Amino acid sequence: MDKLAYKNAVNKVFMAVLITAILGVLASIFSAFIATSAALDMTQAIVMGTSMPFTGLLSVLILPLLVVAANIYYVVCLGHLAKAVHENDVPAVKKLRTAMILSVISSIIGLCIFLVILSGSLTAIATMGAVIGIACAVLSIIAYIFTLIAYSKLKASETFPGKDGAKLLFIGAIIALCCGVLGAIPFLGVIGGIGVIAAMVLNIIGWLKIKNSEVEETAAAE
């Protein structure tokens, strides 16, 4: 592979991961503490014809939009990485890119709840909220499966320079998947939250190790 092209691509991916993680933390904080009340305040504002509260716009629309934008940048960076890695590793990176595309689609579908809130109908919010939630969950599960397969192939690859980092990414993805299950079980949400933090840290460290890995000059993938 072309060492310079690979390094540039990995640096961009790492930056995308970092930005996504920071925005994800901010979105989670707002989701945990004010998103529900903010959504209700927005609904009340729509019904009464008053201006929307800034906290509502921030938690329900602005932060999620920023997360989507960061994930789209992540997808673009993975596309560059797929062109820079050894041809043996191209399918795995493309599968990871597909997983991120599914995550972006899931996030965009999730943003549709904002349009439902604009209707001002509590019944519509409850019904469509459930439908949107199920659709997002299905897409997220498929994305996680693709992610696990991609990381599994990269950590076992003989041509991928950052195998040690890929191992951490694989572990982090498993933890994140388990946390998603735990988060749906009453009274286990706290454990799931701790696991999500651990998965995020492993994701950052994993890509950092890949970023700092030694690269040998070989033919780049077409």
Could you say what each language-model-derived stretch is?
Residues 116-117, 123, 127-133, 179-195:
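Short hydrophobic membrane-inserting alpha-helices and related fusion/pore-forming segments
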Residues 1-31, 35-51, 62-113, 135-179, ...:
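Membrane-interface extramembranous regions at the lipid-water interface
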